[in-house]
Amino acid sequence: VLAHERQARIAALVGERGVATVSDLAAELGASESTIRRDLDRLHEAHRLVKVHGGAMALERAHLTRDLTLPDRYGLHAGEKDAICRLAATLVGPDDFVYLDAGSTVEALASLLAPTRAAFATNSVSTALVLAAKGLRVIVLGGELVDATKALSGPDTTEAIARYNFTLGFWGTNGVTAEAGFTVQDRGEAAVKSAALARCARPYVLADASKLGKRSLITYAPLEAATLVTAGDVPAQWRGREGVVVADAAGIGDNGPVEDGEPGR
């Protein structure tokens, strides 16, 4: 079996099962464990799965239970993220003071922003650099740097947030359910998200359809605390729900374009 064929089979098996061990993959594919480990290295580098001790985990499952690095997240559901961010970008007005959460979806939004008088604040180093490269006004909140996500976190971050009053804000999430609301896996991340959302007049959470119905470890806000903007294969129970906007490929909400700073419902 050629290496690329074996790796494709490994990626498919891990995707189907959510998690697989090196020994199980070796037995199923008739390859040595050392060969499987090398294949997992290649697949991890290609962002097709996440290599963990003793095996591998599907990206979607890993995203709910551990912090993926930003490169791991960039390739996930790119089309859906683009649709979400196109809609979100239309919400930013020239007089807004906008909070931008750390994460790949919100960073993608930053890359789509047009020149504006609006001011921005973020706890994401990478998002701050995107904004600065566009010549936009950006405040970088202090705190301890989390290398995997390039986010600033901790009490210094939440104290800085408490000084500001945001007119608009955008957050990411690992999962969202009606019962648990918006969830992440890290307490420090949840604390920063909650603190910023509490200081925001018009909060939006950006999450592609793969995160709907998924629950991570810690709730940072109930579902009704923010408008959810989503895209992709959205289940029927989420469509038409109050506070949920489904964006199409052109960045238009399911009930029409954004008007007067509020999304179509």
Question: For each predicted feature, which ranges?
Answer:
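Conserved phosphate- and dinucleotide-binding cores of soluble alpha/beta proteins
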Residues: L2-A12, E16-S23, G30, E45, ...
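HTH-adjacent hinge/linker in prokaryotic transcriptional regulators
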Residues: L2-Y99, A110-P115, A119-F120, A132-L136
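A generic "binding-loop/recognition-motif" signal
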Residues: S104-T105, T127
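Short glycine/serine/threonine-rich phosphate/pyrophosphate-binding segments
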Residues: T105-L109, L212-R215
